[in-house]
Amino acid sequence: MLNGILGRKIGMTQIFTEKGETIPVTVIEAGPCVVTQLRTKDKDGYEAVQLGFGEIKPRKVTKPIQGHLKAAGRLVRFMREVKTTDLNAHNVGDVVNVDIFQIGEKIDVVGTSKGRGFAGVVKRHGFRGGPATHGQSDRHRAPGSIGSGTTPGRVWKNMRMAGRMGNDRVTVQNLEVVKIDLERHVILVKGSVPGAKNGLVMVSRAAKATKK
């Protein structure tokens, strides 16, 4: 059985439970994915299944990639590898749908966070900034001291400073599957998922599933 599937984040909404409670959910279009390659221990040193997801125009695909996808019989925009418990159960060209998950199951979602550009320490690291009065004029959102003087005579590594924020690989763990729509290839997940709308996400079984 495959450990995960590729998809895209559609957006967020809310649904009502039988008790009338509202639950914030993220709508993810998970699959359908096609198996584009099988990784074997003899050839690659490990076992995995390469999945393809998304549509793309043929003129935008290079000829080497077209040759790679010829056996799958379909051109795809994204390709990622996922773990599997039984490699022999899959063949190149097989279609993987969202039915590999069940309602109530815990999952992990990997996505790329929204890029925020160059950000200061208040926005990037949550610094409180300097005092608003008592002679302050241009240091309200400044970081303050970044180190000593002659000793050590340099700025330590990993010092929290201003810089580019976001556009990073982010993993959110132990999200609950609330609803599955097999016809629309849609899965509803409780809570938020990293990334912007239409962003690529990897949905996989929880690596550290917690039991209630």
Swiss-Prot record:
PROSITE patterns (UniProt xref):
RIBOSOMAL_L3
Residue span of region Disordered? 127-153
Gene3D superfamilies from the UniProt entry: 3.30.160.810, Translation factors
Tell me one GO biological process term.
Answer: translation
Any one GO MF annotation of this record: structural constituent of ribosome
The keyword Coiled coil appears for this protein: no
The positions making up the signal sequence are none
Q: Which GO CC terms are listed, alphabetically?
A: cytosolic large ribosomal subunit
Keyword line: Ribonucleoprotein, Ribosomal protein, RNA-binding, rRNA-binding
Q: Does the keyword Ribosomal protein apply?
A: yes
* Subunit annotation: Part of the 50S ribosomal subunit. Forms a cluster with proteins L14 and L19.
Give the family this protein belongs to, as stated in its UniProt record. Belongs to the universal ribosomal protein uL3 family.
What this protein is reported to do is described as: One of the primary rRNA binding proteins, it binds directly near the 3'-end of the 23S rRNA, where it nucleates assembly of the 50S subunit.
The protein's name in its UniProt record = Large ribosomal subunit protein uL3
Which classification does the entry list for the species? Answer: Bacteria, Bacillati, Chloroflexota, Chloroflexia, Herpetosiphonales
